[in-house]
Swiss-Prot record:
Annotated protein name in UniProt: Pre-rRNA-processing protein las1
Quaternary state and interactors: Interacts with crb3, gcr3 and eix1.
Taxonomic classification: Eukaryota, Fungi, Dikarya, Ascomycota, Taphrinomycotina
InterPro entries: Las1
GO CC, one annotated term: nucleus
PANTHER family referenced in this protein's UniProt entry, alphabetically: RIBOSOMAL BIOGENESIS PROTEIN LAS1L (PTHR15002:SF0)
Gene: las1
């Protein structure tokens, strides 16, 4: 059996590339971003070795079709000519030259392409509409005679690259856990030691720097197998997470005995936990530009996932609850770490320079938290609502309402029976007064136009041309 070396490692890579150029069943045209992505992947693969002619031709034809510059006509002519020559020249093996039309019939290539190639080479270039139509017909021919047969052929590749990655991740995770265990054991004994002194002053500083460098180096190492969908995005966070050990290192930090206590602990223990791990986080963040953004993003995903497991109809005040479950305790500490990192980044602390948090980001987080009723997002609101005065004023009625809901309790049937009609009226009057206050405040500071509420700025009248100090 003939074996050929190809630039993709797995059939899934080939299928992903095919999906960039062709929709399933060739129905419609893929979006422009997918076409560009396919061209980029082939360009990256070309650095690995020879690209099959049909794959390279597809890339050239697509590039010519999506080009908008003045040279599109010439680009289409060249790509069509190469498409025909690349198919027919390799089978021209006779001692005497065989007409191209005959060779074309042997591979079921319409003679239309041969005639068009002859016109491009020896006559005046055909018009742009003719070339565009020819390029599209060439792509259809390539789908029928190369891409679809290759995609549906039985794969003889028995090597499981996914399993290789999983074994690699297991080994890396064990290594990272050992390094974090070393740090935890030493830091608990030397909890007050300054870890940012010059390296030459203390031996423990040298050991600390060596441990940090080992973690950073490990995080930067590539996975054994990188999917085709992650080619040529070197400066992208998603690329770093999907193709290196960064995701493994970050996940190790979010386990028990690291950023989460080994057993259920009250939230008041957080300052002590922070004192243990903050120097290590700060040092890694200064040496790995993606570490802090990856940790921040993963924390948020974990918090949202845990919050979905809490019954939205039950409001828990964790400060008064006698015993927390493991999941509740973990969720609280993840929320505390997330709020701490966001506060540090929002206030511009130097060690968080790789993590950008704008007012829009802060507002988005607060809005999402306000839509949830779990105790973890309440922690985030309590920590972050005071960071920005403008946002605090904007959301204050919602903050107050949510706080009141958390202070309330779900009553059983017996407790409902004990409530008198007068008590219910008093409670209703209280809410009415609050609603009137909110409406009065809205009337004085907002106006409605075409269904939208606009906040009116409080600006004193002044003569035209006079500078108003804000």
């Amino acid at each position: 059996m003939d074996m050929k070396v190809v630039p993709w490692r797995l059939k899934e890579d080939f299928l992903y590339l095919m999906s960039c150029f062709y929709n399933e069943g060739q129905e419609g045209i893929p979006d422009l971003a997918a076409l560009f992505r396919g061209v980029e992947i082939i360009q990256a693969w070309s650095t690995r070795g020879r690209i099959p002619h049909s794959v390279e031709s597809t890339s050239q034809l697509v590039s010519s079709l999506i080009s908008n510059d003045r040279s599109q006509k010439l680009a289409l002519a060249v790509s069509i000519s190469r498409f025909v020559s690349g198919l027919l020249d390799p089978i021209q093996q006779s001692q005497y030259a065989i007409p191209m039309a005959v060779l074309a019939k042997s591979i079921d290539l319409p003679t239309y392409f041969v005639e068009l190639r002859h016109a491009i080479t020896h006559e005046e270039l055909p018009s742009l509409p003719v070339l565009r139509q020819a390029a599209q017909r060439a792509l259809s021919w390539l789908y029928d005679h190369y891409w679809n047969p290759a995609a549906t052929a039985e794969s003889e590749d028995t090597y499981d690259y996914t399993e290789t990655n999983e074994l690699h991740k297991f080994e890396i995770k064990r290594k990272v856990k050992d390094l974090l265990k070393q740090w935890r054991s030493w830091r608990k004994v030397n909890v007050s030691a300054n870890m940012f002194l010059p390296v030459e002053e203390h031996d423990y500083i040298q050991q600390f720097e060596a441990l940090v460098q080992e973690l950073v180096t490990t995080a930067n190492l590539r996975l054994p197998y990188i999917p085709a969908s992650f080619v040529d995005d070197e400066k992208d966070l998603d690329f770093a997470i999907e193709t290196t050990n960064l995701d493994i290192v970050v996940s190790c930090f979010l386990e028990k005995r690291v950023l989460i206590p080994s057993r259920t602990m009250p939230i008041s223990f957080f300052p002590k936990l922070k004192n243990v791990w903050l120097p290590l986080l700060q040092s890694i963040a200064s040496k790995h530009s993606f570490f802090l953004p990856a940790l921040f993003t993963t924390l948020w995903s974990e918090i949202l996932e845990i919050s979905q497991t809490v019954d939205s109809l039950v409001f828990l005040d964790l400060k008064e609850k006698e015993e927390l479950t493991d999941k509740e305790s973990a969720g609280c500490y993840l929320a505390k770490w997330y709020a701490y990192l966001m506060r540090e980044a929002y206030t511009g602390q130097p060690w968080t320079s790789t993590l950008s948090v704008t007012q829009t980001d802060l507002a988005s987080v607060l809005e999402i938290c306000l839509q949830r009723s779990d105790p973890f997002t309440k922690i985030i609101i309590d920590e972050l609502s005071i960071l920005d005065k403008e946002l605090e004023n904007k959301f204050s009625p919602l903050f107050q309402y949510r706080s009141d809901m958390f202070d309330s309790r779900i009553l059983d049937e017996q407790e409902f029976e004990d409530i008198t009609l007068e008590q219910m009226k008093t409670e209703l009057n209280k809410f009415s007064v609050r609603l009137n206050n909110i409406e009065a405040q809205a009337d004085s500071s907002t106006m409605e136009f075409q269904g939208h509420v606009w906040y009116k700025p409080s600006v004193e009248p002044s003569p035209i041309g006079q500078i108003i100090e804000s």
